[in-house]
C-alpha cells in the first residue's frame, strides 16, 4: 500500500493534504477486508493523517505565521482603546489654550470628518484582504513596492519612538504622587514589564486590552457624567457654571504669533487643527490586528462602523464639557511642572474642588499610558513582522513562537524604548522632540497612503469587473471621501511646521518640523532605486488575490452572547 502524503503549501502558509493513500486504503477495505481487518485499515488511515498533521505543524512555514486568536470583542476594544489615549487626555490642552473652546471644538469636528474618511477607506480594504499591518501591505500591492516599504518602515519607527515617549511619561505620572524613585529607574522597570507582556500569545494581549479599554471607557463616561453635574451646579457655591467661561474670557482663544486679533485667532485655529490631527492618531489600529483576527469579515466592519460614535462621544463630548469647565486662559494649561497637571481633564477635576478624584484620575492616566505602551510594542512588532513576511526586512524577524508571537520583532521594537533616557539626560530635549515629530508626521503619511491605496483599490476591482456592492464592507461616499482625506492630510503635512516661519524664520524649528518629510523621501528614493520599479503599478498588475482566497475558504462559528453582561459588553465594544 502506498502511504505517502503530499503536502502543498498555499500563499498564506496554510496546507492542503492530498492523501492518496487514504483513498487506496478505503478501496482496499471494500474489496478485501471485513470485521477486524476493517478496524486495522481505519487505524492505518488515521495514522497516516496524524503523521501528515505532525509534518504540517512542524514545517518551517508554520513557524512564520501569527495566530488568529483575537475575538470580536477584542478587536472592538482595541479599536476603542486606540482612540482613548494620551493624545486625548493630554493633547487637547494646547488647542483649548490657543483657539478657545469653540475654536477647538470646530477643529476636532473637522478632523473627525477626515479620520472618518480614512477609516472608511481602510475598512473596505481590510475586510476584503485581512492581513497583518494591512495598510503597509496595501501600499505595496496597490501603489508600489517602494511606497509600501517606506510606509511600513516610517510607521514602525513612529511606534518605536512613541514607545520611548510612553516610557518617559509613565515615570512622570508616578511623580504626581512621589519623586522618591528616579525617572530612569521607572523607565527600566516599565520597559521590562511591557516587553515581557508582549512575549505572551496574542489572545492574552487581547484580554489585557479588553480589560484596560473597559476601564478607560467607564472612566471617560464617568467624567462626562461628573462634568454634566458640575456644569449644572453640583458642589458649586456660586451656582451653575453653564457657559460662564464662554462669555469670560470668551469662546475664542487669543490666537498665536500675529498681533492682529483676527489673524492671530485664525493661526491659533490652524495650530489647534494640527494638534487635533496628532490627537486622533491611533484610530487606524484596527488595520494592524486584521491578520490575527478570528472571523475578520465580521469583527472588523463592526469596529469600523462605530468610529463615528467614538469620535462624537469620547472626543467631541469630552472636549465640549472641558470647554465649559476650563477657561482657555487657565495658567495650568501651559504648566511646565508635573506632566499630568497640564491635562485639561485634571484641571477641570481640581477646579471642581473634589479632593479624591484627582488621585483616581491620575491612576486612570497611568493605566491608559501603560496600555498605550503595551500597544506600541504590539503594533511595531506586527508592522516589522509584516515587512519581513513580504521580503522587505530580514527573514528571521518573521519567526514566531508556538503561540504565534514574532519574538525577534518584539525585541527589535522594544529596544528603541531606551531612547527614553534622552528625556532624562541634560541637553537632550531637542533630539527627543525631533523623534516625537517623526512619530506624529509618520502617522499622517500612513493616513495619506491608506487613502491613496483605496483609490487605486477601487480602480483595480472595477477593472476586474468586481462590484463594490459585493464586497464584505462597502465604504460610504466613495471615492469622494478618499480624495477629501488625501487633500487635507497632505495639506496638514505641509503646513504643520508653519510656526517655524513666523514671526521670523527659525532654522532649528524648521528642521524639527519637517525632518520626517525628508526622512520619508530619503527612504522612498532608496527603495525606488533598490526595486527599480514603476512609480505606480499598472492597474492590471495590482494583486487583489493574495491572502484573500484563503480567508474565503475559512468558516468561523461565533458563540452567542448568553448572559446580560455579555450582551452589554458586546454593544459597548
Curated annotation (Swiss-Prot):
Source species, domain of life: Eukaryota
Protein's UniProt name: Basic amino-acid permease
Bilayer disposition of the protein: Multi-pass membrane protein
PROSITE patterns: AMINO_ACID_PERMEASE_1
GO MF entry, a single one: amino acid transmembrane transporter activity
Region feature Disordered, mapped onto this chain: 40-66
Species whose genome carries this gene: Saccharomyces cerevisiae (strain ATCC 204508 / S288c)
Family named by the database record: Belongs to the amino acid-polyamine-organocation (APC) superfamily. YAT (TC 2.A.3.10) family.
Keywords for the protein's UniProt record, in alphabetical order: Amino-acid transport, Membrane, Transmembrane, Transmembrane helix, Transport
GO biological process: amino acid transmembrane transport; basic amino acid transport
Amino acid at each position: 500500500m502506498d502511504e505517502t502524503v503530499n503536502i502543498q503549501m498555499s500563499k498564506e502558509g496554510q496546507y492542503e493534504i492530498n492523501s492518496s493513500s487514504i483513498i487506496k486504503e478505503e478501496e482496499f477495505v471494500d474489496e478485501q477486508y471485513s470485521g477486524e481487518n476493517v478496524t486495522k485499515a481505519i487505524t492505518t488511515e488515521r495514522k497516516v493523517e496524524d503523521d501528515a498533521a505532525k509534518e504540517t505543524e512542524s514545517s518551517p512555514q508554520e513557524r512564520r505565521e501569527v495566530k488568529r486568536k483575537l475575538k470580536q470583542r477584542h478587536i472592538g476594544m482595541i479599536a476603542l482603546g486606540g482612540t482613548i489615549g494620551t493624545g486625548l487626555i493630554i493633547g487637547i490642552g494646547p488647542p483649548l489654550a490657543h483657539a478657545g473652546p469653540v475654536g477647538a471644538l470646530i477643529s476636532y469636528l473637522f478632523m473627525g470628518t477626515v479620520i472618518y474618511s480614512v477609516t472608511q477607506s481602510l475598512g473596505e480594504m481590510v475586510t476584503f484582504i485581512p492581513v497583518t499591518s494591512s495598510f503597509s501591505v496595501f501600499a505595496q500591492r496597490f501603489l508600489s513596492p517602494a511606497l509600501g516599504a517606506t510606509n511600513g518602515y516610517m510607521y514602525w519607527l513612529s511606534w518605536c519612538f512613541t514607545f520611548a515617549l510612553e516610557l518617559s511619561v509613565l515615570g512622570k505620572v508616578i511623580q504626581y504622587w512621589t519623586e522618591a524613585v528616579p525617572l530612569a529607574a521607572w523607565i527600566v522597570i516599565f520597559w521590562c514589564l511591557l516587553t515581557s507582556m508582549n512575549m505572551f500569545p496574542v489572545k492574552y494581549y487581547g484580554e489585557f486590552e479588553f480589560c484596560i479599554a473597559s476601564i478607560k471607557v467607564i472612566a471617560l463616561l464617568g467624567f462626562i457624567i461628573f462634568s454634566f453635574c458640575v456644569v449644572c451646579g453640583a458642589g458649586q457655591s456660586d451656582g451653575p457654571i453653564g457657559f460662564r467661561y464662554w462669555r469670560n474670557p470668551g469662546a475664542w482663544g487669543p490666537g498665536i504669533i500675529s498681533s492682529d486679533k483676527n489673524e492671530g485667532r485664525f493661526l491659533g485655529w490652524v495650530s489647534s487643527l494640527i494638534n487635533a490631527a496628532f490627537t486622533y492618531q491611533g484610530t487606524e489600529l484596527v488595520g494592524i490586528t486584521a491578520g490575527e483576527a478570528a472571523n475578520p469579515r465580521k469583527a472588523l466592519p463592526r469596529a469600523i462602523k462605530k468610529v463615528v460614535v467614538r469620535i462624537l462621544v469620547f472626543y467631541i463630548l469630552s472636549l465640549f464639557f472641558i470647554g465649559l469647565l476650563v477657561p482657555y486662559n487657565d495658567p495650568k494649561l501651559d504648566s511646565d511642572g508635573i506632566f499630568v497637571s497640564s491635562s485639561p481633564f485634571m484641571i477641570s477635576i481640581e477646579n471642581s474642588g473634589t479632593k479624591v478624584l484627582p488621585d483616581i484620575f491620575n491612576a486612570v492616566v497611568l493605566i491608559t499610558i501603560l496600555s498605550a505602551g503595551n500597544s506600541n510594542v504590539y503594533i511595531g512588532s506586527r508592522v516589522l513582522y509584516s515587512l519581513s513576511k513580504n521580503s522587505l526586512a530580514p527573514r528571521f524577524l518573521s519567526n514566531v513562537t508556538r503561540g504565534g508571537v514574532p519574538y525577534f520583532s518584539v525585541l527589535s521594537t522594544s529596544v528603541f524604548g531606551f531612547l527614553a533616557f534622552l528625556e532624562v539626560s541634560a541637553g537632550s530635549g531637542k533630539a527627543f522632540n525631533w523623534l516625537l515629530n517623526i512619530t506624529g508626521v509618520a502617522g499622517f503619511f500612513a493616513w495619506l497612503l491608506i487613502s491613496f491605496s483605496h483609490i487605486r483599490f477601487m480602480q483595480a476591482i472595477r477593472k476586474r469587473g468586481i462590484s463594490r456592492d459585493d464586497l464584505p464592507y462597502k465604504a460610504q461616499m466613495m471615492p469622494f471621501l478618499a480624495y477629501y482625506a488625501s487633500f487635507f492630510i497632505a495639506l496638514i503635512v505641509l503646513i504643520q511646521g508653519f510656526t517655524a516661519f513666523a514671526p521670523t524664520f527659525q532654522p532649528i524649528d524648521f528642521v524639527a518640523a519637517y525632518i520626517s518629510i525628508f526622512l520619508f523621501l530619503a527612504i522612498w528614493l532608496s527603495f525606488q532605486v533598490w526595486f527599480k520599479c514603476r512609480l505606480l503599478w499598472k492597474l492590471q498588475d495590482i494583486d487583489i488575490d493574495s491572502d484573500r482566497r484563503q480567508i474565503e475558504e475559512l468558516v468561523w462559528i461565533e458563540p452567542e452572547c448568553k448572559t446580560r453582561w455579555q450582551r452589554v459588553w458586546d454593544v459597548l465594544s
